[in-house]
C-alpha cells in the first residue's frame, strides 16, 4: 500500500485523532447539545400540554361565566317581575285607598249636606210659623194668646211636609 501513497503510521494516527475528536465532540458537544435539545423538546411538550389545559380551563370558565350570566338574567327577570307585581299591587292599593278616601269624603259631604238641609228646613219651619203667627195676629187685629199660638203652630206643622224629599209644601 505504500505504492498507493498510504502510510500506515499516519493513517492510524489520523484514525486515532478522528476517534479522539469524535469522542471529545460526543462527550463535550453532542451529548450536552442533545441533552439541551431533549430538555427543550420536553419543555415544548409540557408547554403544549399546559396550553391545552389552559384552553380547556378557559372553555370551562367561559361556560361557567355563561351559566352565571344566565342565572343572573333569570334572577334579574324574576326580580323585575316581582317588582312589577309589587308596583302593580302598590298601585292598586293606592287606587283602592284613593277610592275609599273619595267615598269617605263623599259620604261626609252628603252627611254634611243632609244636616245643612235639615237645619235649613227647621229654620224655614220656624220662620213660617213666626210669619203665620205674625200675619194671623195682624189679620185678626189682636195679639194671640199662647194657646192660640200653640194651636196655630200645630195646624201649620201638620200641613208642612215632614218626610225628606218633599220639596213643595201642601196647600190643604
Curated annotation (Swiss-Prot):
It is found in: Cell inner membrane. The keyword Transmembrane helix applies. GO terms for molecular function: proton-transporting ATP synthase activity, rotational mechanism; proton-transporting ATPase activity, rotational mechanism. The keyword Aminoacyl-tRNA synthetase does not apply. Keywords: ATP synthesis, Cell inner membrane, Cell membrane, CF(0), Hydrogen ion transport, Ion transport, Membrane, Transmembrane, Transmembrane helix, Transport. Its main location: membrane. One of its GO terms (cellular component) is proton-transporting ATP synthase complex. It is a single-pass membrane protein. The chain crosses the membrane at residues 11-30. F(1)F(0) ATP synthase produces ATP from ADP in the presence of a proton or sodium gradient. F-type ATPases consist of two structural domains, F(1) containing the extramembraneous catalytic core and F(0) containing the membrane proton channel, linked together by a central stalk and a peripheral stalk. During catalysis, ATP synthesis in the catalytic domain of F(1) is coupled via a rotary mechanism of the central stalk subunits to proton translocation. Belongs to the ATPase B chain family. F-type ATPases have 2 components, F(1) - the catalytic core - and F(0) - the membrane proton channel. F(1) has five subunits: alpha(3), beta(3), gamma(1), delta(1), epsilon(1). F(0) has three main subunits: a(1), b(2) and c(10-14). The alpha and beta chains form an alternating ring which encloses part of the gamma chain. F(1) is attached to F(0) by a central stalk formed by the gamma and epsilon chains, while a peripheral stalk is formed by the delta and b chains. This is ATP synthase subunit b.
Amino acid at each position: 500500500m505504500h505504492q498507493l501513497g498510504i502510510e500506515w503510521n499516519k493513517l492510524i494516527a489520523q484514525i486515532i485523532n478522528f476517534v479522539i475528536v469524535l469522542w471529545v465532540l460526543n462527550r463535550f458537544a453532542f451529548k450536552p447539545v442533545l441533552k439541551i435539545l431533549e430538555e427543550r423538546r420536553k419543555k415544548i411538550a409540557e408547554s403544549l400540554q399546559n396550553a391545552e389545559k389552559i384552553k380547556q380551563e378557559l372553555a370551562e370558565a367561559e361556560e361557567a361565566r355563561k351559566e352565571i350570566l344566565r342565572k343572573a338574567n333569570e334572577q334579574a327577570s324574576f326580580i323585575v317581575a316581582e317588582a312589577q307585581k309589587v308596583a302593580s299591587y302598590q298601585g292598586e292599593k293606592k287606587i283602592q285607598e284613593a277610592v275609599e278616601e273619595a267615598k269617605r269624603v263623599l259620604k261626609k259631604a252628603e252627611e254634611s249636606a243632609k244636616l245643612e238641609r235639615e237645619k235649613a228646613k227647621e229654620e224655614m219651619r220656624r220662620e213660617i210659623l213666626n210669619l203665620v203667627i205674625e200675619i194671623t195676629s195682624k189679620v185678626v187685629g189682636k195679639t194671640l194668646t199662647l194657646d192660640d199660638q200653640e194651636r196655630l203652630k200645630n195646624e201649620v206643622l201638620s200641613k208642612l211636609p215632614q218626610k225628606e224629599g218633599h220639596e213643595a209644601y201642601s196647600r190643604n
